[in-house]
Structure formats: structure tokens, C-alpha cells
């Protein structure tokens, strides 16, 4: 979960988020090395008294500063494309959940069940119980089984929304008239919070998302109680 004054990412709860964290560290290291080299060159230019006014061309240098950036871009692009294809790959999901964005709440439908639908509204601050999180708690949580492939179908009834859960590495636009899909696989149980990540009106900040990931046995008990 997130912590006050946190600067980094939330702990990864899915294989995709773990890959994204590794890619972030990989890219950040490349950026750090390039920035260090640029600062070193600038400081050397400011402190040295040597000049090369007679130099008209330098084929070796031009070759290096053409090939080296290309290699660096390839080192960034290859792992990025790998993760992109992983995020779009959906193989035999065990469960499908349809998510619809509204101004300003979410509705969910478990399409594998005959009549398992509900709306999810934010709990007002005045109604919170001790220990509950302000602006993040909802009246109906999305209960899902852990360690299973879940397909999320996401759309909107009115304006643009975005369904995002940072610790799972999920952020999918909810667009009216279009059905987007994403895959969710949680590696451990727990409560995972997200919010609408697309400005959608005056109450945009009051559209939280709460996923409750539980073992399959407890999910079956919950789904039976909801029918």
C-alpha cells in the first residue's frame, strides 16, 4: 500500500507490476549514467583552457554519437516492448468482470454469474470507521480470487474515466462506446486501492477503487452469498 510522503512505487502485487518496477530501475540507471556523462563534459568545458579552433570535422566522434544513442534506445525499447506484449496477452481467463464508469461511481458485473452486479460508491468521511482510509473506502468492494487470471472489461456510461490500481500495475481508460480489456493476476491476498485517473468532472477525486483479493475458497463463499 502507499505510505505518507512516499516517493517510490507501491509494492508490486502482480507479475506485470514487478516487470514494470524492474524496467523503471533499468531505465533510471541509463538516465543516471547519461546525466552524469553530460555533467562531466559540461564541467570539463568550463574548467579547461584548451581549445580546438582548427578542428573542422571528426568522423570518429560523429560515428560514436550516432551509434551509441541508437544502442541506448534499443536497450530501452526491447524490454519495454516485451512488457507491452505481456500486458496485452490474455489466455483463458478464469473470471471476467465488467467495469463501467459513471459520474461519479463504478459499477461491476461478474459476467460468469447470472446476476452478480453492484455499484461501488465512496464512503463519505463522516461515515468512516476507525482505521478506514479517507477518500479511498467504498461501500462495495470488488472481491476477486488471487493467483488466477482475471479479465477486466472496462467502459463508461457517460464521460472519459480511467480505472487504475497502482500496486497491480493497472491503468485502463474507460471510454464511452468502447470496451477496453486488461488482465489482472494477484500474487497475494489483501486490500488494494486505486482511483479514477482521468479528470471526469467536479467529483473526479471521489471515485475510489477497492479490490479485495482472497483465496478461491473465500471467493466462492462470497459469490454464493451475493447471489
Curated annotation (Swiss-Prot):
Recorded hits in Pfam families, A to Z, give: COX2, COX2_TM
Mitochondrial matrix topological intervals: 46-59
Tell me what topology the record assigns in the membrane.
Multi-pass membrane protein
Q: Does the keyword Transport apply?
A: yes
Q: Which domain of life is it from?
A: Eukaryota
UniProt: Cu cation A1 binding residues: 161, 196, 200, 207
Q: Does the keyword Protease apply?
A: no
Question: Where along the chain is Cu cation A2 bound?
Answer: 196, 198, 200, 204
Those parts of the protein on the Mitochondrial intermembrane side are 1-14, 88-227
- Compartments where located: Mitochondrion inner membrane
Which keywords label this protein? Copper, Electron transport, Magnesium, Membrane, Metal-binding, Mitochondrion, Mitochondrion inner membrane, Phosphoprotein, Respiratory chain, Translocase, Transmembrane, Transmembrane helix, Transport
What does the note accompanying the cofactor annotation read?
Binds a dinuclear copper A center per subunit.
Residues spanning the membrane: 15-45, 60-87
Q: Which reaction does it catalyse?
A: 4 Fe(II)-[cytochrome c] + O2 + 8 H(+)(in) = 4 Fe(III)-[cytochrome c] + 2 H2O + 4 H(+)(out)
Q: Which GO terms describe its molecular function?
A: copper ion binding; cytochrome-c oxidase activity
* Gene3D superfamilies from the UniProt entry: 1.10.287.90, Cupredoxins - blue copper proteins
Quaternary arrangement and interactors, per the entry?
Answer: Component of the cytochrome c oxidase (complex IV, CIV), a multisubunit enzyme composed of 14 subunits. The complex is composed of a catalytic core of 3 subunits MT-CO1, MT-CO2 and MT-CO3, encoded in the mitochondrial DNA, and 11 supernumerary subunits COX4I, COX5A, COX5B, COX6A, COX6B, COX6C, COX7A, COX7B, COX7C, COX8 and NDUFA4, which are encoded in the nuclear genome.
* PANTHER family hit by this protein: CYTOCHROME C OXIDASE SUBUNIT 2, CYTOCHROME C OXIDASE, SUBUNIT II
Q: What biological function has been recorded for the protein in this entry? A: Component of the cytochrome c oxidase, the last enzyme in the mitochondrial electron transport chain which drives oxidative phosphorylation. The respiratory chain contains 3 multisubunit complexes succinate dehydrogenase (complex II, CII), ubiquinol-cytochrome c oxidoreductase (cytochrome b-c1 complex, complex III, CIII) and cytochrome c oxidase (complex IV, CIV), that cooperate to transfer electrons derived from NADH and succinate to molecular oxygen, creating an electrochemical gradient over the inner membrane that drives transmembrane transport and the ATP synthase.
Q: What name does the UniProt record give this protein?
A: Cytochrome c oxidase subunit 2
| Species of provenance | Equus asinus
Q: Which gene encodes it?
A: MT-CO2
